[in-house]
Every structure is written in C-alpha cells, then in structure tokens.
C-alpha cells in the first residue's frame, strides 16, 4: 500500500507535468521571441499531512511531502518559461473521506470493501484543533486553487498555499 500511495499522490503529478513539458516549453519560447509574457499555471494538490505528519498515515504523509518537493523543483526549473508552479495544502475539508463513518461511502479496493469516513469522536476532536472551529467546505478549498490559476497569482511562484482554517 505504501507504493500505491506514492504512485497516486507523487508519481502521477510528476508524469502529468512531464507530459506537458514539450508543448509548454515550445509555446513559451515562441512567446518570448515575440515579446509576449504568458503565464501558465500548475497547481499541485497536497495536504498539511505532508508537512505536519499524521499518525497512522506515514505513506500518505510521505507522498504529500513529495508533492511539495516536486512543486518547488518545477518552479525553479520552469520559472524562466513563465510557468507558475504552486501547490495547495488542504487541512480538514468536508468530503466523503471525512464524513461521519456511519454515513460514509464504501469503496472497493482490490476486491476488498473499505468503509470511508472518520468516527464521530475523532471528527469532534479534529474540529477543536481548527481555530475557525469547523472543517472547510469544498467551495472554500476550490477558492485557493482558483486563485492560483488566476492572473492575480502571476507573481506567486513555488509556494504552498495552506487551506486549513488556521491549523
């Protein structure tokens, strides 16, 4: 399971970025020759688990830490091409993975049914650790990604934006 977590959260973003490289480099060279400045955006998705760790999730935390390193490296390598590479690190966001375990979906992985969600007692404790007092919404999480994709973030580069409610 450790390798699967690395593959999903670290290797896949690397491969997507690598696939973009030829076309984005060529376009950037043409724009530079024409005197145009066009910013392209890469927004990787990570988690505060990648910087803070999370008990019982060494695989996930390691994979998300890898995304942060990938983001910073791509930012350094592609900055001259006007490719802004940033990441968003989510804290506790309400999703089916963080729903109450009693109400959560069941997912099948390799033929085994896995119940998703967090026990209510842990959900309550997690909310107490957030200074804003509640988990974030999917819309609030999307706002950070939207900002990093917008022209307002053209000078934001190689950064990880924490969407955590203050965790």
Which residues are covered by each model-predicted region?
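Substrate-binding pocket helix/loop in short-chain dehydrogenase/reductase
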Residues: 1-3, 126
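A glycine/serine/threonine-rich, flexible loop-to-helix segment
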Residues: 80, 92-129
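C-terminal substrate-recognition "lid" of short-chain dehydrogenase/reductases
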Residues: 134-163
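Residue(s) in the substrate-gating loop at a strand-loop-helix junction
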Residues: 47
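Active-site helix of classical SDR
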Residues: 17, 63, 71
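Short, small/polar-rich loop/turn modules that mediate ligand/substrate recognition or access, typified
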Residues: 79, 84, 156-158
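Active-site "substrate specificity/gating" loop of NAD(P)-dependent dehydrogenases
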Residues: 53-57, 79-80
